[in-house]
Amino acid sequence: MSPSWRRLAVLMLVAAFLVPAPPAAAAALSDAGFFGRWSAGAWTVGPRLNYAHAGLKPVESAVKAGNYALAKQRLLDYYRARPAIEAGGFSHTTWPGVLELTPSHIWTLGSGEVYVKTLTFGPGEKTVTADVTSSIASGKPGFFLMSRHKDAVIALINSRSKGSGKPTLRLTLADGSVKTLHPTHDTYIWQAHPGSVYGTKYYMQVSDQGLGPFTGETRKAYLGFDLGGVAGVKKAELTLTGTAETAKDIMLYGNAETFDEATRTWTNTVQNTFSWEGDPGGFDWKLPDGADNEYLYQLPRFYFAGPLALEYQKTGNEQHARTLIGLMTDFIKDADVYDADQGAGSYPGNLHAARRLHNWIAAYEILRKSPSLTPEANAAILKTMNRAGLYLQVNVNGTPNKMQSQKITLLHASVYFPEFRVAPAWRTNAADFLSAQLNDSTYADGGYKESTDAYLRGYLRQYVDVVAFMRRNGITFTATAKLRQLSRFLMDQSYPSGYGPAYGDSDSLDLRSTFEKLGELLDDPELLYVGTSGKSGEKPAHTSALYPDTRVAISRSGWTADDSHLRINADRGNHSHPDELAITAYAYGRPLLPDMGTFTYSTDARAKWLRLTTEAHSTIEIDDQPQTSTAAGGISHLITNPAFDVIGANTESSAGARHERSVLSLHSGLWVVSDRLKPVDTVKQHRYEQNWHFAADANPSIRSGTEATTTAFATGANLAIVPADPAEVASTLRDGYYAPRFYAVENAKYASYVKTAPGQTTFDTLLLPSKGAADTSATVERLPVAAAQPYEATALSLNDTAVYYKSWTAKTPRTFGSYTFDGKLLYADAGTIVMVDGSSVERAGATLVKAPAAVKDLAVTFGGDGTVRIDGSGLTASTDPAKAIAIAAPNAAKVILNGKAVPFQREGALIYAAA
């Protein structure tokens, strides 16, 4: 048991003597259970309030007199008069429609569906136009329609199949031109007929009535537009024509999800917006049938508390206070009977209870003086917050971000509620845990145990806030060094643009503000540099990085937005995907091989493909099966050099074969990926599918003959993917999905290269990024290696101008083309020689490089001005031919060794400058 968990166990035991035990069954906390019961001069039920705290004597007197109604009034009087205490911030501050729709018990999960406005149709036919510029500008090419009120009226909205009055999207572009689009797909779904498809109907039906989140009369409509090739939209207007017998209000939402009208049904649609409008019971705080599980978790977090409380604070409009207080007390009434632990305080568990309490504390600081807050409601809210703290004090969860959130909220509660008897124990419990938890949540190399950069960003951002909070309140934080190490880990994962690579359950977020805050908090100039895009701080002293325990390696050419970045992983843990040895690659300002993202945690087929299949990642899927996460594997090495990196990795996560992947990363602008597959059964035919994934707007194509895949983004960088054995692979562009952020998904093409073979086999692939259009002429030709099969040693001719060699087995002198080499890896072109663990390179019998002993890593670059740059680990200046490396450089005029000019000696075409 780690020290932090031991401390937690001790504090749990101590806490048991401070407060009464929680009820054995789900129930509300009684007045006596909160205020205590006084009888015959003693407390027969201990109070949860510390009546010795200044100002609480009137409450105590009322309780001892048995008058709980008076005690509640005096407790409210106390909190209304209490000086302000730092209450923390809200998780959310506002979003479109929150003030209008929340009082009607209409709520949306996530950001994939965003409210635009309410439209009115009927009576009779009516055409309406809505400004949807903000929706289009935020990357939402679709819309959905939903009834604003629960009533019997059905609206019929013309579909694209209608001869006239079909939906129209009018786009005004930056150059003043206007483009008019009709939907490429539109349809509606109907709960009473969950498997029916309505994509060819003339009308889209919209209606809703009855209690609960939906009934058999619930119908929702969806429209999707193709915005491919459209850029610079200055204004967007959506025009719809529809009819209704009487006036019918319809909510219009922007939607970031693509769909197929020929297959969309109620059953296969992931719905994120539900309405309890008109239901006297309001939200039931449970999971609607068919919804993403996150709906159950996130609705009770009270994200809307911030917008409502802040609007009340700003305007003084009591309606906002009444709405929020009503939602809080409704939640307490319902959830007190849902959870046998601490009732509404613990429902629906760990992170969700913590997020809610955090929002409630911040809201209470604003609401405590509201005339709408009654003594009864105030007591109910305080009881629930007390119960939530007790739950967070003892609840254990193995996920780092959940435990962190619990203890951060507990710490805030301990500071904000000094009146609670248990507050000192909360403070000690939370502060100790937050300092110790960084050891439990990280590997020995400093990497994060959850395989997701988005969650790590949130984890670090919360540490930024809580450490500052602790310092303001005189609470010691002792894990600064570990926090710095973890911050550096995320810094290494980040793209040169400062965005995250979106591995695991993530979306690509701008990490720079987090790095800037961490740099300021930790006084770290390198974090500050990355967080400000080089405007402050100091450039990191390193580029590439290896995390052997976390099982991740990053090859990076530098820290500016135009630098290159390649990440390869064999990592595991919570939120990981079956993506071992997957590559993400970035160059010239763009992710060229991005991670495909997550979409949702639902059972939607697209989300399951993204999260649960190996096929959805840029690695090799074996025998059509996803990888497992329990087999051997890891990053075997990262060799770094100012001119190049070499990464080696392996995994046995596919039952049929061991996959080994080697990457040569030339910082001058290319990657070569070599894969070797070693099956357990060498007789059986195995199917190996090497996949390369792109963003939705990459427009990839495959060139016949070379089978090279090239992207064609409208602007900016592109990528060519060139296989070494085009005749031996079945190459196709396949249909997949890309989720650029949570709750958004787009159709996306990806390149698939399939080999079916017994025994060992290989893939060798050139990845060639370009600043503009992709190089469609790039070629890769396999060079025979004397006395070796490709799975023993592979050699390639790249564009007929360069040669690449990789030995999979013990090094020995081998000949390929006109070259002879005795090391593990070689790359050579007219201006560069790169070698790993070798001593001799010859071309057509002439020496190019000759060292007295094997050199770990060596890069020689020949400049047109006669400058020869030599880079290598452990090399020192030497002109002694008996000790130094001989390099063929007949035109050498100057030698730079590891960044410094050094003398050199010439003997014929050879020079000696380093040993």
Model-derived features: positions:
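Extended extracellular/luminal ectodomain segments enriched in beta-structured repeat modules
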Residues: K140, E217-K220, G229-E237, G669-W671
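Flexible, small-residue-rich N-terminal segments that precede or flank a structured functional core
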Residues: L99-K126, A137-S138, M146-L227, A244-K248, ...
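Carbohydrate-active enzyme catalytic cores, enriched for enzymes
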Residues: Y443-P594, T756-T762, A778-A884, P890-A892, ...
